[in-house]
Amino acid sequence: MNKKKLGIRLLSLLALGGFVLANPVFADQNFARNEKEAKDSAITFIQKSAAIKAGARSAEDIKLDKVNLGGELSGSNMYVYNISTGGFVIVSGDKRSPEILGYSTSGSFDANGKENIASFMESYVEQIKENKKLDTTYAGTAEIKQPVVKSLLDSKGIHYNQGNPYNLLTPVIEKVKPGEQSFVGQHAATGCVATATAQIMKYHNYPNKGLKDYTYTLSSNNPYFNHPKNLFAAISTRQYNWNNILPTYSGRESNVQKMAISELMADVGISVDMDYGPSSGSAGSSRVQRALKENFGYNQSVHQINRSDFSKQDWESQIDKELSQNQPVYYQGVGKVGGHAFVIDGADGRNFYHVNWGWGGVSDGFFRLDALNPSALGTGGGAGGFNGYQSAVVGIKP
């Protein structure tokens, strides 16, 4: 048998054996958005954004600075560009996913050391990988009228963080992992769960008085404390003076004002069984909805909803409903690099939602809640495991 006939026979056997002959590398090349194309996409998006252009005297003033995504996000098939006049644009590196994933008209993007941002971005990575199984470009979804809601927290200047002075009353780190010796004796970070919740409470300036004390024991698996470690918050005795709990802190505030916010943060953290650490903390959204009602006296309308129970359209309708009633939404998910909690407090009416990450305004902007191609969602529009761990706490009002 000559080589030509042998080659034909081998190909036939592969086909009969069920092997896919289409080379996935070639498929990726067909749908890949290279760096030049990504930059062009960002420029086109900026040119259509009056808010971004307003910060520049002319189009020539606008320069793009590519952000290097490190850690879990390296090689993530996304391009992030900070805009010289303020703001950023996040572009997908594959045409089977939405072209623009997120943007901001001010500030800059930075995910380094910010687990909730990195975790959310990592969910984009996983969804883009899922979209690569398709052989069709992203076509979007049918146009659905969505409300435009300006950032509710921005309207009151609310931008909290996780360090000083917000964490002045969190537990003090007692021991550390190798290489973390500098953290010993420092207060733990407030945690993104407490920060997100406290920002919503500041928006409502409620309650004036706490309702119920809370105590719990830190998990014995926590490597930063000697065990057993019991934490207690005398919430029932608290008088929350919202005039002293400021919308944001620069470090120049009075001690009374600093202690006011740190007391709120500590109470919230303890009320949700915060698993404290030197640079982050974790807790579940089910505990947030319980704490708001039982410990802080919020309306019984407060409840948790899970992304896996809704189609994409119905899920976003739930978020839209809350925002239309001027109620910021507590949002949480879980990814490979940990959990992420943040506040959704606005919408641009084009499937982008305004996110306050709880890092003093860093990386705040408009983001898609997912990057899945509708063709990957299947019947009913569910999101499989990609959004299965996302949840929100809604109905938050006094």
Swiss-Prot record:
One of its GO terms (biological process) is symbiont-mediated evasion of host immune response. Gene3D superfamilies: Peptidase C10, streptopain (3.90.70.50). One of its GO terms (cellular component) is extracellular region. A protein binds at residues 282, 339. The active site is at 192 (nucleophile), 340 (proton acceptor). Monomer. This is Streptopain. It comes from Streptococcus pyogenes serotype M28 (strain MGAS6180). The gene is speB.
